[in-house]
Regions:
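Alpha-helical bundle regulatory/interaction domains
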Residues: 1-42, 81-82, 91-212, 218-219, ...
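Long amphipathic N-terminal alpha/beta scaffold segment
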Residues: 36-74
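Glycine- and acidic-residue-biased ligand/ion/polar-headgroup-sensing regions
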Residues: 57-59, 66-95
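Generic hydrophobic, amphipathic alpha-helix propensity
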Residues: 197-201, 248-253
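C-terminal helix-loop subdomains that flank or include functional centers
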Residues: 225, 251-253, 257, 276-277, ...
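Short hydrophobic/aromatic patch on the recognition helix
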Residues: 232, 236, 284-285, 289
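Alpha-helical DNA-recognition elements
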Residues: 238-239, 291-292, 303
Length: 321
C-alpha cells in the first residue's frame, strides 16, 4: 500500500481552491480538454475541492483533490494517460466496468474511457503527455516496469516543490515526460528509485510550511534541524538544489497565490495579501511572483474570473442523474 500522507506536489500551481461545483467541473473540463466530463457529488452543497495544473511543451500534470465525495466521469484522451494516487485511495471504473481501488500507478490507453470516485481528502495526479510524447511500449508495461515508472513519477513530484522557479519547473516537467518516452531499462530503477528527504531537512520543510507566522532566521532554523547554519545551508543546497531562504520565499509566495486563487472580490487586494507575507514592495513582489509561477498576480486572479465568465451549463446538465 502506498504512503498517503499530505504532499505539496503542485501547490505552487494551484488554480482553484475551495471551489464550488460549477467552478470545479468547468475548470476540470478546461484543464483536461474533455468537454463532456460530468460529475456527481455524493452530498449537496459546499466546496468540491481544489485543482492544480502545470503545463510544459511535453505534457500537462493535473492534481485533483476532493474536499467532499464525488464521482467524475467522461475522461478521455488521444494519448496514454498516467494516473497516480497521492492521498487516500480513490476508485476507478474503466470502460463502464466495476469500481476498483486505484492504489498504484495506472497507465490508460486512449480507448480507456474512465471514471473516478474520490472520497473526501483523496488526491489524484493525472499526467497527460502531448501527442507523440510517449512511446507505444508504455501501454504494454509489465508489473516490474510499472513499479519503475511509479518511482520515476514519484521522483518528479518529490522534486517539484524545490524548483527555483517556473522556468525550472517546466524544464523538469519536460525532462520527466522525455524520460517516460524511452523504453524501460534497469538503469532507470537505480537512477530514479524513490528516496526519502533527509530527516533534518524534513523538519526544516515542516517548519517553513506549517508556521506561516515564522520570520526567517537561519540560526533558529539550523537549531531546529539540529545542525549548524553552514551545514544546513549546504545540506539543503545539495539535497534539493535550493537554499533554505529560497524555499522560505517560495512558500510565502505560494501562500499569497492561495489567497489570490480564493479571491472573489471585485477589487483583489493583492498588496494586502503580499504585505501579510512580508512583501513590502509591490513591484518587486510581482516580479518574484512571475519568476516563481510564470504569471503576474493579476493574471492568477484573472484566470478564475475568466472561468466564471464562461458559458457554464446548468446544474442539471452538469450533474449526472
Amino acid at each position: 500500500m502506498r504512503k498517503t500522507s499530505p504532499k505539496p506536489d503542485l501547490d505552487a500551481y494551484l488554480r482553484l481552491n475551495n471551489a464550488s461545483f460549477e467552478e470545479w467541473i468547468t475548470a476540470l473540463r478546461v484543464l483536461s480538454g474533455c468537454d463532456d466530463i460530468k460529475c456527481r457529488p455524493h452530498s449537496g452543497g459546499g466546496s468540491i475541492g481544489s485543482l492544480s495544473a502545470l503545463d510544459s511543451a511535453r505534457g500537462r500534470v493535473i492534481s485533483l483533490k476532493a474536499s467532499k465525495g464525488i464521482d467524475v466521469s467522461g475522461f478521455r484522451s488521444t494519448e496514454s494517460v498516467l494516473l497516480l494516487p497521492r492521498e487516500g485511495v480513490p476508485e476507478i471504473a474503466i470502460r463502464g466496468g466495476l469500481w476498483r481501488p486505484l492504489d498504484r500507478l495506472l497507465v490508460l490507453v486512449p480507448q480507456d474511457r474512465f471514471e473516478l470516485r474520490l472520497a473526501p481528502g483523496t488526491k489524484v495526479m493525472i499526467l497527460r503527455p502531448e501527442i507523440g510524447a510517449l512511446g507505444d511500449w508504455i501501454a504494454q508495461s509489465s508489473d516490474q516496469c510499472l513499479s519503475v515508472l511509479e518511482a520515476i513519477v514519484d521522483c518528479y513530484l518529490e522534486r517539484l516543490p524545490f524548483v527555483r522557479g517556473d522556468e525550472q519547473a517546466r524544464q523538469l516537467t519536460n525532462r520527466f515526460f522525455d524520460t517516460l518516452a524511452t523504453p524501460w531499462t534497469p538503469r532507470k530503477a537505480a537512477v530514479c528509485s524513490e528516496r526519502n528527504l533527509d530527516r533534518r531537512l524534513q523538519r526544516v520543510v515542516e517548519k517553513i510550511m506549517q508556521d506561516p507566522a515564522w520570520e526567517f532566521d537561519l540560526k533558529e532554523l539550523a537549531s531546529y534541524a539540529g545542525v549548524s547554519e553552514r551545514n544546513l545551508y549546504y545540506l539543503m543546497k545539495r539535497e534539493t538544489g535550493i537554499t533554505p531562504y529560497r524555499f522560505y520565499q517560495r512558500a510565502r509566495l505560494t501562500r499569497v497565490r492561495e489567497r489570490l486563487v480564493d479571491c472573489q472580490c471585485e477589487v483583489p487586494h493583492i498588496s494586502w495579501y503580499a504585505a501579510d507575507e512580508g512583501f513590502s514592495h509591490l513591484g518587486r513582489f510581482a516580479a518574484m511572483y512571475r519568476e516563481h509561477f510564470g504569471e503576474l498576480p493579476s493574471e492568477t486572479v484573472q484566470w478564475r474570473r475568466n472561468l466564471l465568465r464562461r458559458s457554464v451549463a446548468s446544474a442539471e446538465e452538469l450533474v449526472e442523474t
